[in-house]
């Protein structure tokens, strides 16, 4: 997986899926049959996104295993998962404001990086003061995203100042870990869950950013790039159309010439 330049987070996820499945099947990979694997996954109440991710992990593992050990690939039986198109779920601003009011400065910054700059949990974890840039238009942050891809996101003066103020001396990490590096994406996700009222999460802060960014300029391609999506179709799942735009669209259908 490292040879394919997969991110450490993706590698950890793939390994976790394979290990969980191995514990559930209680046998060596060479003993797994297509019927066993299909029966096992069919008992899991996974949402479509989780199921899609698990199937991808298992298909990759068994493709490698069957190639190395000349073994029938049982994962070929796994069907294609139809991924749903969930509605955007931006956190209401009043709930976000309440959560921010009770935060320490560092915890507040974690929420703001997702809500005001659209960062994923893994991207928040990797924020470093050295990634702040400035030009004639203001400050920006170099974001280290999925698949080792980078993007540049404009940030406010206040956000830039908070990043610099809270950065660990010497390393520049805003969320330093115990080993001289940074915390894990899971740590940031759990932090968000502890600070936000249920069912709101760090991911719904990204939805909030996408919705507000689109409402400001109605430029879906710009929002796509800000969020770091590979396609506009993904961005559409993050953006709740402004109510005034929905009303104008509906009203236009009421006119009969």
Protein language model features and the residues they cover:
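N-terminal core-binding DNA-recognition domain of tyrosine recombinases/integrases
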Residues: 1-87
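Active-site/catalytic core of tyrosine-dependent DNA strand-transfer enzymes
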Residues: 156-199, 203
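DNA breakage-rejoining catalytic core of tyrosine-based enzymes
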Residues: 71-72, 82-98, 147-157, 169-172, ...
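C-terminal catalytic core of tyrosine-transesterase DNA break-rejoin enzymes
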Residues: 112, 116, 208-230, 237
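Catalytic-site neighborhood detector that most strongly recognizes the C-terminal catalytic loop/helix
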Residues: 147, 227, 233-252
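Short, charged phosphate-coordinating catalytic segments
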Residues: 114-137, 221
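Conserved tyrosine-mediated DNA breakage-rejoining catalytic core shared by Y-recombinases
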Residues: 126-165, 233
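Basic, Lys/Arg- and aromatic-enriched nucleic-acid-binding interface segment
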Residues: 93-121, 125
